[in-house]
A protein has these predicted regions:
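Intrinsically disordered, low-complexity proline/glycine-rich segments
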Residues: 1-101
Length: 101
């Protein structure tokens, strides 16, 4: 699967904001197409969660499963299809494939 990086798209699974991106911090020592690699535990950009009209800002951590064979700064690298709270990472770097894809 394509490796995720800071700025990769995330479908949130929330009614208030359907989409967000990975905010990071990412792995500043591992750049994918010039952008820090995303890892398990990195956060999304703040976005609205809840059911309209009751919405509140929050962030979500990447919860995986990640790629256990590619460790970046002590954490598994994240990839398209990984879970993010109620959502999923939907975009990544097509030039960097991880976990046998």
């Amino acid at each position: 699967m394509p490796a995720a990086r800071v700025g990769s798209a995330v479908v949130t699974g929330h009614a208030c904001d359907a989409a967000t991106t990975i905010a990071g911090p990412g792995a500043t020592t591992v750049l994918i197409e010039g952008v820090p690699a995303a890892r398990l535990g990195d956060l999304t950009t703040p976005h609205l969660a809840g059911i309209p009209p009751i919405c509140s800002m929050h962030t979500m951590p990447i919860i995986g499963p990640g790629c256990p064979t590619v460790i970046v700064q002590g954490q598994p690298i994240s990839k398209v299809g990984d879970n993010v709270d109620a959502g999923t990472i939907t975009s990544g770097a097509t030039t960097v494939l991880v976990c046998g894809s």
